[in-house]
Design a protein with these regions (language model features):
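Extracytoplasmic/periplasmic substrate-binding proteins
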Residues: 263-327
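Alpha-to-beta junction loops
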Residues: 95-103, 117-119, 209-211, 281-286
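Short amphipathic alpha-helical coupling segments at ligand-binding clamshell hinges
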Residues: 200, 328-341, 346-350
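Extracytoplasmic ligand-binding site segments that recognize negatively charged/polar headgroups
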Residues: 61-64, 113-274
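N-terminal secretory signal peptides
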Residues: 1-23, 30-38
Length: 351
């Protein structure tokens, strides 16, 4: 589980590929069953109001099927824009009028919240709030769980009031974002081309794979993969991978810079499709990877494994956030959409 392993909360960007990103996704609500939906009462229907919700996010959950179901159940027309992680953060920070709801990643909160374009979300309006798992409230999945390193979601989940600017360490009734999905990532491998067991992050820099390794080129995520590798190699013991010292940063970057100079990496990838193409072609046999990309490689008839590693996983989480420009009836529609999103159908679909 997320909070019981050595994890860094990060996130990923996906392209507009039609390949399903559902594999291994988990809903941010502990119980999102069809039965739960029945206890919420019928959702409001907005069809006669010609309501359009502009959703901007990374594409992890930007499915046409979800938009169609929202139209069927709520009468809302969803316009979904999928971007890479850095572009999403930039858009949220600089173009709040260009969207009504943001599907963003928890690591982004420290970047975008201080700018002041987002509004806190009232948890009393979230019908399934009591079912949101503890990872997003106090950092623990169970009472005995160990809180993860990195930007653990609960550290940026709450602010100190409706107009709060500071993150709160405890529940306040006002969330920066309402959690929707989370997962944990590891290395992807081509077992047919490696022909031996892989059980540690350290293998990414094994000279055996010189010219056939890859790592993702998204700085906020890539640095975490790099840290997992360096610690697995015994080169660095981090105090907190999500809050590295300058010395830790320099040493981490130094190790990977030397590996790059030595020709360890075939390429660096930034998008979902790039990672799929590198692995499916056989140009790369071991790399940072996302579970849906594994599925995409397999769909091309190539063996590909999402390899469990003894050091644990790098986790990520996402949710819906509200810009200050979304007000009145439009804000009411956003809350209605989120309640519908957490009521069962979407959770079942994404799983």
């Amino acid at each position: 589980m997320m909070s019981q392993t050595k994890l860094e909360i990060s996130m990923k960007a996906n392209s507009k590929s039609k390949i399903s990103r559902r594999s291994l996704l988990k809903s941010g609500v502990a119980a999102t069953t069809a039965a739960a939906a029945g206890t919420l009462g019928a959702p409001m229907i907005w069809a006669q109001s010609n309501i359009v919700l502009r959703q901007s996010g990374t594409g992890v959950s930007a499915f046409n099927e979800i938009a169609a179901k929202a139209k069927e159940d709520l009468g809302i027309t969803m316009e979904m824009t999928a971007l890479d992680s850095d572009s999403v953060a930039q858009k949220v920070a600089t173009q709040p009028k260009s969207f009504d709801i943001a599907d963003i990643e928890y690591w982004m909160c420290k970047k975008v919240w201080p700018i002041g374009n987002m509004q806190a979300m009232d948890t009393s309006k979230i019908k399934n709030y009591d079912k949101i798992v503890g990872i997003f409230k106090d950092g623990k999945l169970t009472p005995t769980s160990t809180i993860a390193q990195g930007t653990a979601p609960h550290t940026v989940s709450f602010v100190d009031g409706a107009n709060g600017k500071n993150f709160s360490s405890e529940e306040t009734g006002w969330m920066t974002m309402i959690p929707t999905i989370y997962n944990a990532d590891t290395l992807g491998i081509r077992p047919d081309l490696i022909n031996r067991p892989i059980n540690t992050w350290a293998e990414l820099l094994n000279p055996e794979f010189k010219g056939k390794a890859s790592i993702l080129d998204i700085s906020s995520i890539g640095i975490m993969d790099m840290a997992m590798v360096c610690e697995a190699m015994g080169e660095i013991q981090y105090g907190d991978k999500g809050n590295m010292t300058r010395e830790e940063i320099d040493k981490t970057i130094g190790i990977f810079t030397e590996a790059k100079k030595a020709g360890q990496f075939r390429a660096f990838w930034k998008t979902f499709d790039e990672s799929v193409n590198l692995m499916a072609s056989g140009e790369v046999v071991i790399q940072s990877m996302w579970s849906p990309a594994i599925t995409a490689v397999k769909a091309q008839g190539k063996p590909c494994i999402y390899q469990p590693l003894k050091e644990g996983y790098r986790a990520w989480a996402a949710g819906f956030a509200l810009p200050k420009t979304t007000k009145g009836k439009q804000a009411d529609v956003v809350y209605e959409f989120i309640n519908w999103y957490l009521s069962g159908w979407v959770g079942a679909y994404l799983n």
